[in-house]
């Protein structure tokens, strides 16, 4: 596919705007670029490569000449337009969760399973942001020994809830500073100076839908259908970049030295691990970056076959927009 026509569905949202930025940064070869959104955004201009692209309304006809469609819209919008996109012969790289677990839809992290993208039937799904960041960090270790299980706790930034998340955090901090009452709208409780241990809806055995994604999506991406994952997802008062504490268990023991070497050599990873010198991954450092930072690598004291680590990554870039553009690059 040479100089494909690219259409962004949901171009005015945070992920859609980041897709535009990343397409330009990576010099993605584009024939024609179209930006689609809802009717209320029609007529707005978005900047790309020194020019302005006018936003058009998303309709079935708007995909007629597309070769690649980058989806940055909600599930219902993705499902609404997927048939029209497929009918044109375009490839729909979708960031929503609408198709992730469909058997005939590849779920792809290019550093891990790029070959899966080549077996698509018109749709390729982008995994959940926390799934991408976690798996990029641990995938290098599976080359040393198969992963049998993982226990993870995510610390997810407020921007993961949309553009209103950082606005609400800032407003609450300002209100508290002035001694005024806090009125949450985006989150169920005050997020300023607080943690909220629920992201998503109630799902299975007391887990939330967000927590089950790491197991369900991880199994599919790693081709490990029996891998067991327990996850706790927490919203934290950080503006951007998610962090994950992971304990991974393997078929054989892996030394810390082996793990560090594997992660240092892994695509998409940056080893940041020198505890005595206070060097470790932090969300502030990974914001606006595409690499996943990995550190705090140490033995699991409860299981000789386990390793613990801490990873951070920008959930808007590598956790969403960059991963989608990388998938598109596989199709060129």
State each model region's role.
Residues 9, 69, 158-332:
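Charged docking surfaces used in two-component/phosphorelay signaling
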Residues 1-191, 227-228, 252, 292-293, ...:
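N-terminal Rossmann-like NAD(P) cofactor-binding subdomain of oxidoreductases
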């Amino acid at each position: 596919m040479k100089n494909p026509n690219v259409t962004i569905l949901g171009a005015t949202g945070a992920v859609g705007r980041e897709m535009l930025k990343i397409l330009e940064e990576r010099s993605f070869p584009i024939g024609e670029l179209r930006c689609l959104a809802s009717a209320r955004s029609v007529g707005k201009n978005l900047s790309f490569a020194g020019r302005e692209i006018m936003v058009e309304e998303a309709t079935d006809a708007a995909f007629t000449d597309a070769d690649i469609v980058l989806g940055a819209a909600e599930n219902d919008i993705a499902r609404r337009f997927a048939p029209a996109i497929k009918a044109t012969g375009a490839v729909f790289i979708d960031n929503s969760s609408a198709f992730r677990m469909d058997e005939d839809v590849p779920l792809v992290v290019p550093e891990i399973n790029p070959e899966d993208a080549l077996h698509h039937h018109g749709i390729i799904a982008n995994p959940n942001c926390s799934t991408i960041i976690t798996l990029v960090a641990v995938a290098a270790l599976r080359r040393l020994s198969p992963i049998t299980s993982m226990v993870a706790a995510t610390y997810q930034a407020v921007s993961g809830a949309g553009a209103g998340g950082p606005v609400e955090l800032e407003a609450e901090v300002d209100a508290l500073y002035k001694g005024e009452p806090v009125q949450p709208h985006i989150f169920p409780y005050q997020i300023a100076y607080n943690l909220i241990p629920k992201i998503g809806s109630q799902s299975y055995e007391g887990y939330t839908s967000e927590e089950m994604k790491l197991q369900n999506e991880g199994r599919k991406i790693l081709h490990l259908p029996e891998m067991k994952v327990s996850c706790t997802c927490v919203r934290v008062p950080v503006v951007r970049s998610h962090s994950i504490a992971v304990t991974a268990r393997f078929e054989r023991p892996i030394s810390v030295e082996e793990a560090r070497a594997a992660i240092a050599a892994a695509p998409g990873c940056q080893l940041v691990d020198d505890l005595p010198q206070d060097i470790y991954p932090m969300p502030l450092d990974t914001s606006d970056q595409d690499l996943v930072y990995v550190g705090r690598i140490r033995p699991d004291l409860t299981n000789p076959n386990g390793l613990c680590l801490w990873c951070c990554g920008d959930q808007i870039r590598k956790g969403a927009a960059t991963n989608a553009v990388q998938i598109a690059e596989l199709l060129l």
